[in-house]
Amino acid sequence: MRAFLRNQKYEDMHNIIHILQIRKLRHRLSNFPRLPGILAPETVLLPFCYKVFRKKEKVKRSQKATEFIDYSIEQSHHAILTPLQTHLTMKGSSMKCSSLSSEAILFTLTLQLTQTLGLECCLLYLSKTIHPQII
């Protein structure tokens, strides 16, 4: 069972890193305050990443191009808090065996999100703090 959970965590972490690499984000260029609190596990963050980053295909003449579009381009980062809170509340209620409470995760993510410039920055910051030795 432990091996399965360890493999699942690695797979989730790999997916987050892949999303961030697709967006061509560079973690060395970002400078964020180190906030105290409980960091969200990657299994909580991953589904929200997929809601935020969507794949849109555009057809230009005879050429087909794939672009990654950010849902939040026209919104302030504060507007992102509502869907994030909804997602974490639903995810937290399904995490019966977790030692982290959804309220603690939500509080920490809210702090991190409101102190960064945008959602991409928030996701990047969280990925750095979840697995700093890998990224």
UniProtKB/Swiss-Prot annotation:
Keyword Cytoplasm attached: yes
The keyword Electron transport belongs to this UniProt entry's keyword annotation: no
Coiled-coil region: none
Subcellular location per the Swiss-Prot or TrEMBL entry: Cytoplasm; Nucleus
GO CC annotations, alphabetized: centriolar satellite; cytosol; nucleoplasm
Alphabetized UniProt keyword annotations: Cytoplasm, Nucleus
Principal location class: cytoplasm
Protein name: Prostate and breast cancer overexpressed gene 1 protein
